Amino acid sequence: MATSKVERLVNLVIALLSTRGYMTAEKIRSSVAGYSDSPTVEAFSRMFERDKNELRDLGIPLEVGKVSALDPSEGYRINRDAYALPPVELTPDEAAAVAVATQLWESQELITATQGALLKLRAAGVDIDPLDTPVVIASSSGVSSLRGSEDFLSILLSAIGSRQAVQFPYRPSRAEPYTMRNVEPWGVITENSCWYLVGHDCDRNATRTFRLSRIGSEVAPIGPAGAVTVPDGVDLRRIVSDAVAEVSTGATARVWVVDGRATALRHAGRPAGVRRLGGRDGQVIELDIGSIDRLARDIAGHGADAVVLEPDALRDDVLIRLRAHAGTGPS
């Protein structure tokens, strides 16, 4: 199969950045993947000339010089110092975008491809710099690592672009089991150095955020492309900020707690009367709702000793978590 133009140009840049000296056109033809496809020297020369012009048009500093004092042949290389970018000031959104691209490039699939290209150059006798002195691309220190999430991040981004629903295992915390979620994805956002998927949770029929580090690796697109509609004017960053905020949203939950148990919830709430439920004496408390996911997790942790009376959305969320712990589906 013929090598694509983009792949050939990338191979050429890797080769010319990695070589210590100048590479002759003959060495490039024999060792850089994509040029051996040329059937004749003339065809190679035309292709190589076009590629050199394209690199220069892209602003890549291609240098021409003698191979050595003993070999006056003309060769080529890319000066790393001239190739490197000057310091760049990025906005938080720009830094996040660069971090995504950088960490996708650092994924095992692309690392393997890059190392494979360098090994082929070595095998062809090209004198290149050691593997421990690579060209470095730095990401923003304010953006958390995606390590462990790179594989499925590309699937999520593809699904967002094609407006397709996804299915994946998710756990709200490491102490809880994974449950399968069906989501219409709207976008990926960073907040407080963490990565979140925002979308419509089909199982809960509500807008939800999902921290990428808590998504299992088995992410798969489901349903037809084009089926997902992102609401007009939706503010993904605001959704994430509200979901992870510790401040009160102004909403209140009413929760029944059995006497003598669920002490942490009792201390966090305000007494709102006594009530007997399921044959057990208890107390009704009112709790401010900051993050509904966090509150649902806290309440579910007390099992049958805490029961949500209202709102319905919080009660449903707690029931889903309890059923997941019990290993049963929705009833």
Swiss-Prot record:
* Highest rank taxon of the organism: Bacteria
Q: Which stretches make up the WYL domain?
A: 145-225
Instruction: Please give the InterPro entries that the UniProt record associates with this protein.
Output: CBASS_pafABC_assoc_protein, WYL_dom
User: Which family would the database say this protein is a member of?
Assistant: Belongs to the PafB family.
This molecule's function is given as: Does not seem to be involved in pupylation or substrate degradation.
Q: How does it assemble?
A: Interacts with PafC; with which it probably forms a heterocomplex.
* PANTHER family per record: PROTEIN PAFB, PTHR34580
Q: What is this protein called?
A: Protein PafB
Gene source species: Mycobacterium leprae (strain TN)
